[in-house]
Curated annotation (Swiss-Prot):
Protein name (record): Transcription initiation factor IIA subunit 2
GO terms (BP aspect): RNA polymerase II preinitiation complex assembly; transcription initiation at RNA polymerase II promoter
SUPFAM superfamilies for this protein: Transcription factor IIA (TFIIA), alpha-helical domain (SSF47396), Transcription factor IIA (TFIIA), beta-barrel domain (SSF50784)
Record's keyword terms, sorted: Nucleus, Transcription, Transcription regulation
UniProt similarity note: Belongs to the TFIIA subunit 2 family.
Matching Pfam families: TFIIA_gamma_C (PF02751), TFIIA_gamma_N (PF02268)
Database matches in InterPro entries: TFIIA_a-hlx (IPR009083), TFIIA_b-brl (IPR009088), TFIIA_gsu (IPR003194), TFIIA_gsu_C (IPR015871), TFIIA_gsu_N (IPR015872)
Chain's gene name: gtf2a2
Domain of life where this protein originates: Eukaryota
Subcellular location as annotated: Nucleus
GO molecular function: RNA polymerase II general transcription initiation factor activity; TBP-class protein binding
Assembly notes: TFIIA is a heterodimer of the large unprocessed subunit 1 and a small subunit gamma.
GO cellular component terms given for this protein: transcription factor TFIIA complex
CDD domains: TFIIA_gamma_C, TFIIA_gamma_N
């Protein structure tokens, strides 16, 4: 039997992930889809978005800032930077007061349960 790969649900909180979730919840409430289909679609989204980002995004960005907080739990790093500065390959600079960066171990077979 093949190993079932689990994916982080991190991108469900992105703009596209929230739009998908809102749409699916509306369909579920109006009984156009079942709860199992709802879960299956979200699981497929988790898989697809992770694979698409790892295979197609090639742009590089550097960043620096003052480390306010860091945490490591369940193979997930979380950093909160203050007065951060992001620099793109095109030398565009974006400054933000505070940013949260979440980094997940891509080699983890079993993603932790959502919190």
């Amino acid at each position: 039997m093949a190993n079932k790969q689990n994916y982080y649900e991190l991108y469900r909180k992105s703009t596209i992930g929230e739009a998908l979730t809102d749409t699916l919840e509306e369909l579920l409430i109006n009984q156009y889809i079942s709860n199992s289909l709802y879960q299956k679609i979200l699981t497929q989204f988790d898989k697809t978005i992770n694979e698409a980002l790892s295979n197609t995004v090639k742009a590089k960005t550097t960043f620096k800032g003052s480390l306010h907080t860091y945490r490591f739990c369940d193979s997930v790093w979380t950093f909160i930077l203050e007065n951060a500065q992001f620099k793109t390959e095109a030398n565009e600079i974006v400054k933000v007061d505070r940013v949260k960066i979440v980094a997940c171990d891509a080699n983890v077979q079993d993603a932790p349960p959502p919190k």
